Amino acid sequence: MNKLLFLSILLLTCVTGWANGIRNFYVDSFSDSQVADGSMESPFKSLDALKGIKFLPGDCIHLAGNQILTGIIHVKGVKATSENPLTITSYGTGVSHIYSAHSSAIVIDACENIHVKNVVVKGSGRKKGNTGTGIEVINSRFIEVDRVEASGYQMNGIGITGGGDVRITHSYVHDNGYNGIEVTGKWGTKSVHNIYIGHCVAENNAGNPAILDNHSGSGILVGHVTNATIEYCEAMGNGWDMPRPGNGPVGIWGYESDRLTIQYCFSHDNKTSPEGLDGGGFDFDGGI
């Protein structure tokens, strides 16, 4: 595309966005602005500045690329639309890194039409104090997670609980505890509808040291779902440090679900605990 034409389209998009009341919030840890208002010219210096903002449909949170931002982003109760989603993404050169220490990094709770893309989230480690999930989505719908890297979480790299209509694509989840990617819902139901997981890699999600009565250390796990597709994904090197000899884990699998499709995937070199009696590469488990 002609560079001048591209810039013209970009400028028109920005002007149109402001005309429609869309707000942009910028975070840059290198900001030296004396009066940070979250604008591109005077960005917030830390993620803490986002805590007092009541987010609206169409808002965009821009995180400065090629730097580490410490803290969390928590978005709750935002009912955005497909035309005006709330977006969390990087800007500038490179990808932004969120270090959330012992907590989850990005939490989306009771929301609709939220997009998270082009960010890296990192916790303190599955055995070093973290108890959270990298991208944690709770009872939310029409969620898109794209080109995310998540590591260092005791629970999941990306975790979906309840809700539905979720797409997870082109993401790399590694060195987490419970699972690389998990989708789950209310026990005894198949109430989480329309899940798509594609072109993702789950590697070295070794096991959760806090779970001593069930499996942990799977690559991709889907449960309590109706209508889900997992395709063009790879799971490898997971499960080797599950802290018990019982069931699981598995590279890519599902349970208690209807209309689950796993296709064009590669699951290899996954393991169970040294005394483990179960596990596998792929599995349609109980309730399928």
Indicate residue ranges for each PLM-predicted region.
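Extracellular beta-strand/beta-solenoid scaffold signature
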Residues: 74-76, 99-107, 127-136, 152-161, ...
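Right-handed parallel beta-helix/beta-solenoid
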Residues: 18-49, 65-67, 91
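Surface-exposed loop/turn segments connecting beta-strands in extracellular beta-rich domains
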Residues: 71-72, 91-96, 101, 119-125, ...
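Surface-exposed loop/turn motifs in large extracellular/passenger domains
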Residues: 80-87, 107-117, 135-146, 162-169, ...
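Sec-dependent N-terminal signal peptides
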Residues: 4-13
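Beta-strand repeat architectures
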Residues: 51-59, 79-81
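Right-handed parallel beta-helix/beta-spiral solenoid domain characteristic of secreted/periplasmic
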Residues: 33, 44, 62-71, 79-133, ...
